[in-house]
Amino acid sequence: MRNIRVLVFGATGTGKTSLCNTLTGRKRPTDNGARGITAKSHLYPAFQTDDCRIEIIDTVGLHESSQGTVPAEQAVVELIDLLEKARDGFSLLVQVTRASRITKEHDEDYKFFVEKMTQGNIPVILAVTGCENEYPMTSWVDRNQEAFSRFAYKELVPTCFASGGPMEEFFAPLRLQSREPLLGSIIHNALVEPRKLYGTGTSSSFNQSLTRIWNEFVAVTAYPYTQVMLHKLNAYVPL
């Protein structure tokens, strides 16, 4: 059976946790507030489809430390946690964005996860949420494909993963309608085997990867190094 490990990332409020819940059949809490709710990266239990075993990791938002969900001093702990969950590598990255203009946060998320953390070695697709007002939903991608041409996305997948509220009867079938093509894109675009970011068979150790990723995190979020952060980085020894 083919093993596919997927890292899902995106700015606060893009619907990545709702997307992960729908793909996995789980019910992790979601929040539409500005502060978000993904304060810690979460590894969902693996599920099977089409002779594939799929594991999904929902990441803490890159900008949530500055927006109140994750204190700055805890950010390094969350990066360590994410890197530990990356021990077995990834087969695919899924960036989640709303059906709107390309934001600064979108660019920074892409640079951090695609170019820096995984160094362009793992394919990435874009899941576009909020397409429920389009008919068909693919029309948004048709109109906006060119705007995303500067990114190395293998595919843009229009989706609706909204849930709850008075429109739930409208959202529910659209979530199911979105799940099948997104899963198909994941299976089609994922590497045959997960690719490791560090350790045996790579040119990087855990601590080298952590230092490189942390430096980029600081550059993107403009956090100053604090003594607490430096102590956590310097004292950490991977298991």
Predicted regions and their residues:
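Conserved GTPase G-domain substructure that encodes guanine base recognition and part of the catalytic core
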Residues: 1-239
